[in-house]
Amino acid sequence: MVKHSKGYRTRSRSLLRKSPRERGAVPSLSKLMVEYKEGDNVVVKINPSVHQGMPHRRYQGKVGKIIGKRGRAYLVSVTLGDKEKVIIVRPEHLVPFNSSG
């Protein structure tokens, strides 16, 4: 028997994959220049081509609230189960949350 790996990116084969048309593309400058303010709601959308400031895959698709800034990255408060977690994420992995309603 062989032990299965328990690395940081395990079980992320389909999650951290781009479509063939997007492959190799770096994030657009307009996406990097977005300034978030404290209290803004954002969605964590991992960009697999940018490794810096990448959150763990368990936060993919989660909606959080900006609570501060640390260097180029943002502090995002995310609800995970019944707990509030604070993660440090760079803007390449964030998308503004637009609630319809």
Swiss-Prot record:
SUPFAM superfamilies: Translation proteins SH3-like domain (SSF50104). It comes from the Archaea. Coiled coil: none annotated. One of its GO terms (biological process) is translation. Keywords: Ribonucleoprotein, Ribosomal protein. GO terms for molecular function: structural constituent of ribosome. Residues 1-24 are annotated as: Disordered. Residues 1-18 have a biased composition (Basic residues). GO terms for cellular component: cytosolic large ribosomal subunit. PANTHER family: 60S RIBOSOMAL PROTEIN L21. HAMAP family: Ribosomal_eL21. Belongs to the eukaryotic ribosomal protein eL21 family. This is Large ribosomal subunit protein eL21.
